[in-house]
Regions:
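Negatively charged, low-complexity tracts enriched in Asp/Glu with abundant Ser/Thr
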Residues: 1-31
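Acidic, low-complexity intrinsically disordered segments
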Residues: 46-89
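A short, structured beta-strand/loop element
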Residues: 27, 31-57
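Generic preference for well-ordered secondary structure
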Residues: 6-8, 22, 36, 61-65
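Residue-level marker of intrinsically disordered, low-complexity segments enriched
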Residues: 11-16, 28, 39-41, 60, ...
Length: 89
């Protein structure tokens, strides 16, 4: 049996002029790799959920359409995941 460490964390990110709480959860994908499920709430309290996958050298959003304030911060979300992965090991 292979043990996979559960990784979940939340971080505040300034997006669209407001601090927003992004929640991250790592899980396995069907190809044996890993994905991060990410969710955040918009101004109307609608939960926006999406996935990020490691492609080439960075974590990328793998679905759309998403609000521009989410996609504009993809590089920051990538940095937060990389930081957490370094600290979790």
């Amino acid at each position: 049996m292979i043990f996979t460490k559960n990784v979940q964390f939340s971080r505040l990110v300034k997006a669209d002029g407001m601090l927003r709480e992004f929640n991250f959860r790592k899980h396995s994908d069907s190809q044996g790799g890993f994905l991060f499920s990410v969710d955040v709430v918009d101004l109307r309290n609608n939960r926006i959920a999406f996935k990020m996958q490691h492609k080439e050298t960075a974590w990328k959003i793998v679905q759309s359409p998403l609000p521009e304030w989410v996609t504009k911060n993809e590089h920051i979300l990538n940095q937060l995941i990389e930081e957490e992965m370094r600290n979790a090991s």
